[in-house]
């Protein structure tokens, strides 16, 4: 709404928008709670952000469908004047749970079948290489792609700015709509819940022993 966008602008928020490329790509999997396509509504939201001068970036999931069209995917973001882009490859396993969940948690990810929408290693590699070859020609310094920027930062001995490429993780907790806080936005499962903002502070939860133990999973020599 205009009211929310005014709030974001006044308080210097950076808003992340989940959008998976042009309409035919986005609507393949991004449905609303009624099972309807969501692209039109997402673009309406982006236009509202632009109207109020709110800074925003795109968080784009790369799946089995859109990964085969890397340049169409990348050029779309340039067309809508998006200069900050995060690509997130989706790889999930399916495991049924009594509470209705169907995605496998970290401890279960070897038990279930790979979800049909998962991007393959070959697709993901080709996707990145194709976009990089286009980006490096004339877009460096104008369009910022997180995985490329973070890779360069690591190469130069700088902090990469993204936890998955950093030496240590554990600073990217996530809060759900009801105040529940989890160790990481990639692991919103019951076993990684830290607490709730209504009963504990973020500082307490993010510096808790539970969060410390989660960080150790990342620094462990185990390939997991």
Residue ranges and their predicted role:
Residues 190-204:
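A short, polar/charged loop-to-alpha-helix boundary motif
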Residues 12-23, 84-90:
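Non-cysteine beta-strand/loop elements that form the S-adenosyl-L-methionine
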Residues 28-40, 47, 51-164, 168, ...:
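Radical SAM enzyme [4Fe-4S]-AdoMet core and its adjacent flexible, acidic
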Residues 218-223:
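Conserved small/polar residues in nucleotide/adenosyl-binding loops
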Residues 1-11, 23, 47, 51:
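Conserved Radical SAM active-site core
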Residues 176:
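Short, acidic, Ser/Thr-enriched surface-loop or helix-capping motifs
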